[in-house]
Amino acid sequence: LQGRAAIAWFARSLIHIVGMKMPPSGLFALPLQALSWLGNQGTRAIVAVLLAAIAVPPFGELARPYVTHAIFLLLCISFMRVDVAMLRAHLRRPALVLAATAWTTIAVPGLVGLGARLTGVDAAAPDLTLALMLQATASPMMASPALAALMGLDATLVLITLVTSTALVPLTAPVFAYVFMGETLSLSPATLGLKLAGILAGALAAATAIRLVFGIETIRRHRAPIDGFNICILFVFASAIMAHFLADLLATPFRMLGLAVLAFAVFFLLLGTTMLLFRNAGRERAMALGMMVSLRNMGLMLAATEGAIPGTTWLYFAMSQFPIHLAPQLLRPFAERLRAAPRPPGENDQALISPARD
């Protein structure tokens, strides 16, 4: 009941933000101005969220029961802002989208699962293998298009691939859970698929209702306060994930360091491999796809499992937040150099690159 009350309160707040006239006046002027300021901070706010989440462990303990609700609201906001016209434009040339979708939803989890089995990691460290498999089977992060746009990359390509990949996850995740996760996962594969489908379908239905009531132009006009609200929800999720970070760091520093190194290694391995595979599509599009594939929506998998995962899996999820939150700051200079470099003959990304947002 508390969870339902919380999600209802946040949903009403989101609807109020969308429905508010701009500029705001009266009682809600100051809160909306604060949300707008927060939403305009860009990648700085993403880093600040992680640091703030680490700094307040007691809030993380309070936030843990609401992880599923936070993920649901983050999905609602993302679906609410999808540009249907952009989706249709990329669907006219689906070959690249289909290849990227197959790579991120089928090839990546298949390779991770096979690698763990062939090297014996699945038997030696089943909880860590579960973490890697949940990461690999997850859809890309819903924030991937926005992060691509922030770096001046092709956000529309990322958006359509994100949508197709997310739609397939309720079908592909149970298969990989059955083949590679075994009894380590407390849920049955069928239950996992149904929970994923329910979360995604519910978020899509709520987002569609908001779009129908207010219209896409109103949502665009309120971009800044919605971004600020999104950051607040992200803080709830990050706090829940990082609740035990400081205590675990003090208790087992070398273990935490090892998990952090692994999290960054997985991130850069997925990024680099994807860029190599799709280099013929253009360097900027290859990097955009690399960003999307390396930023996995582990929160969705955490929501589907309702947090019923082993301690090591929780710790890996916590350490994986560092490459996720630091990626825009780390990779933006590289993306700028990539765009400024001379193009090889025949490579043309013009008119396909979404402009960067400050």
Region locations from a protein language model:
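N-terminal amphipathic/basic-hydrophobic helices that include classical n-h-c signal peptides
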Residues: 1-21
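Alpha-helical transmembrane segments of multi-pass small-molecule/ion transporters
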Residues: 15-358
